[in-house]
Amino acid sequence: MDVRYPIGKLQVPEKVTLENIEEWLKEIATYTTRLRETVGSLNEEELSKTYRDGSWTVRQLVHHIADSQLNMYQRLKLALTDENPTVPAFDEEKWAILPDTKLPVETSIKMLEGINERILFLGSTLSEDQLDRSFMHQKNGKITVATKVAKLAWHEEHHLAHIQIALEK
């Protein structure tokens, strides 16, 4: 197993359906509960563990998940409201060392609860036509609403697997 991609790389069907969206939303719906169960009672030593040499700590991963979901949610909304807007990338490495990443992980879990609730509601209202709306990512090019919803679900699971690997070390 490649620990960088413990659940594999993001796989998006060529033709995404509303049923696919529903499945991804089910994963998102249970995520914060599962994340809290995994990290909620960890001590400082456990929060400082990494899943591989040079990787982020468990604490940084939790804060990164919240930061990324926030950014991806904004991109999703822009794709639904604007005509193919261009969105900037964010420097994940620099965000991961900002002072707010020293906060308790519960701060980011609470943030995720709100963001994910909004994602779930918005996602449940999507139409087939809206799945093809898109935005232009500064580095990754054109991304559709369908792909963004897939990534919202995959990204959380991807980093939960990283956290689990770190805690097993």
Question: What positions do the PLM features span?
Answer:
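Solvent-exposed interaction patches of small proteins and small membrane subunits
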Residues: 16-19, 23-26, 82-85, 102-110, ...
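Short, contiguous, helix-prone interaction/anchoring segments in small proteins
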Residues: 19-54
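Short, contiguous alpha-helical
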Residues: 1-13, 48-92, 120, 132-169
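A generic "functional-site adjacency" signal
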Residues: 22, 29, 55, 70, ...
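Acidic/histidine-rich alpha-helical segments that form the ligand environment
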Residues: 26-32, 38, 95-132
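Short low-complexity stretches enriched in small and charged residues
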Residues: 14-19, 27-32, 73-78, 114-116
